[in-house]
C-alpha cells in the first residue's frame, strides 16, 4: 500500500510502519492526509493502539468532559481518551486536553515522555541542563522542559527540529506527518529496543 499524497520517502517509511502495525488510519483508502492538523484524540489513540488497547472506562474523565460529540458512540477516540486519563497521560491541568484540540510540540513531547515513563523507559535527563533550560524558558513547565529534552536526546524529534527550534516553537501546531514521525521513532528506537533487551 502506497498512499498517493505522500511524496517524501521519510514520510512514507514512518507512515507505512505505523499503518501496517495498525497504529494509525489514513484519511481515505489511498491518501494519508499528513498535512492535516494532528488532534489530541488521534495522538492518544495511536498510543492506545501501541499499548494493545487495554480495557478502560470513563471513571477518570473530568466532570462534564462527555458531550454529544464526545461519548462512546459518537467519537472514535473515546476509549483512547478514557484510557489516557486513567493512565495519567492526560491530566486536568494540562494545556491541551480536549480530544479535538490541535496538538502542538509541547503537548506531543509531554505525552510521549509520560508514555515512555509509564512503559518503563528511562526518561532521565541531565538535571543541570534541565534547570538551565527552565530558567531560559520560564513560560514552559518543568515537566514540559524535561519532556522536550528527553525527546531531543532520544532523537524522537531531532529530524523535525533541533532543541532550540523546538523550544522556540513550543506552541506551534503539528501535523499528522509530524505526529506519525515522532511516534514512529518512539516505537522503533525506544519501545522496540527495550523489548529486545
For every predicted segment, state its role.
Residues 176-178, 183:
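Non-catalytic cell-wall polysaccharide-engagement segments
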Residues 19, 85-86, 152:
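Alpha-helix C-terminal capping/helix-coil junction sites
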Residues 22:
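Phosphate/pyrophosphate-binding loop motifs in nucleotide- or prenyl diphosphate-using proteins
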Amino acid at each position: 500500500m502506497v498512499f498517493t499524497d505522500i511524496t517524501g520517502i521519510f514520510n512514507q517509511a514512518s507512515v507505512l510502519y505505523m499503518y501496517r502495525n495498525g497504529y494509525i488510519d489514513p484519511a481515505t483508502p489511498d491518501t494519508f492526509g499528513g498535512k492535516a492538523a494532528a488532534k489530541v484524540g488521534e495522538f492518544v489513540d495511536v498510543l492506545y493502539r501501541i499499548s494493545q488497547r487495554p480495557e478502560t472506562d470513563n471513571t477518570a474523565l473530568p466532570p462534564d468532559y462527555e458531550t454529544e460529540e464526545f461519548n462512546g458512540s459518537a467519537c472514535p477516540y473515546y476509549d483512547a481518551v478514557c484510557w489516557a486519563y486513567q493512565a495519567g497521560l492526560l491530566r486536568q491541568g494540562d494545556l491541551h486536553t480536549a480530544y479535538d484540540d490541535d496538538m502542538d510540540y509541547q503537548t506531543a513531547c509531554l505525552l510521549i515522555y509520560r508514555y515512555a515513563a509509564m512503559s518503563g523507559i528511562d526518561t532521565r535527563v541531565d538535571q543541570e541542563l534541565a534547570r538551565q533550560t527552565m530558567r531560559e524558558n520560564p513560560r514552559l513547565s518543568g515537566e514540559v522542559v524535561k519532556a522536550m529534552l528527553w525527546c531531543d536526546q532520544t532523537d524522537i524529534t531531532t529530524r523535525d527540529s533541533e532543541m532550540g527550534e523546538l523550544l522556540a516553537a513550543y506552541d506551534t501546531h503539528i501535523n499528522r506527518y509530524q505526529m506519525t514521525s515522532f511516534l514512529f521513532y518512539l516505537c522503533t528506537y525506544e519501545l522496540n529496543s527495550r523489548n529486545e533487551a
